[in-house]
Amino acid sequence: MRPSNRTPAQTRPITITRQFTAHAEGSVLVEFGETKVLCTASFTEGVPRFLKGQGQGWVTAEYGMLPRSTHSRMDREAARGKQSGRTQEIQRLIGRALRACVDMKALGENTIVIDCDVIQADGGTRTASITGACVALVDALNWARGKGIIKSNPLKFLIAAVSVGIYNGEAISDLEYVEDSAAETDMNVVMTETGKIIEIQGTAEGEPFTHEELIELLGLAKNSIREIVDVQKAALN
């Protein structure tokens, strides 16, 4: 039995609120249960130096957690003077995932910076960030098309992400913190709206997992991501 009484395949209630802030070209509040992340997409003309003159754009991401997004206050990383390895890993994951769904040639020499700020954390912050950031990205691209900055839509497909794992010997989807912290296996999966895999991060935290369990976890992730994409589409429509 899961602490929330959810079934093994059941995700938490997922909400996506668009245009959550006034200034960003795309902004979304994404909620996976008690995990809440503000995702903004900022569109700027021009690209990093290594891409200049190549006729293509760039998408990158930054990630952070507010000091009291967790049960006890943590210092701001800016106050410590450096980002943690975890933060760097997560923002690279978000950037890689989003670049997979954008046609960089169609974007032209423009840059989109995604900022994912965790307001409240209860497990799955990186997967919630990717899911919300994709919707914010769509809004930023639509803004640029409306302004005539880009002519065609660079979006190739929607992407979403979910955590899956083995908890008390059972494969489950969308882990909350109490499950994540005690899971025997923890995995983050990013997929396209058609179920193609973009990234898998999987670790045996306690017991090694079998090939059969891996296939079961990926099946859970695929079904959950299909449901999450439906939430994205409903928000965009």
Swiss-Prot record:
The keyword Transcription does not apply. CDD domains: RNase_PH_bact. Its EC number is 2.7.7.56. GO terms for biological process: rRNA catabolic process; rRNA processing; tRNA processing. GO terms for molecular function: 3'-5'-RNA exonuclease activity; RNA binding; tRNA binding; tRNA nucleotidyltransferase activity. Keywords: Nucleotidyltransferase, RNA-binding, rRNA processing, Transferase, tRNA processing, tRNA-binding. It catalyses: tRNA(n+1) + phosphate = tRNA(n) + a ribonucleoside 5'-diphosphate. The keyword DNA-binding does not apply. Phosphate binds at residues 86, 124-126. Phosphorolytic 3'-5' exoribonuclease that plays an important role in tRNA 3'-end maturation. Removes nucleotide residues following the 3'-CCA terminus of tRNAs; can also add nucleotides to the ends of RNA molecules by using nucleoside diphosphates as substrates, but this may not be physiologically important. Probably plays a role in initiation of 16S rRNA degradation (leading to ribosome degradation) during starvation. Belongs to the RNase PH family. Homohexameric ring arranged as a trimer of dimers. This is Ribonuclease PH. It comes from Shewanella oneidensis (strain ATCC 700550 / JCM 31522 / CIP 106686 / LMG 19005 / NCIMB 14063 / MR-1).
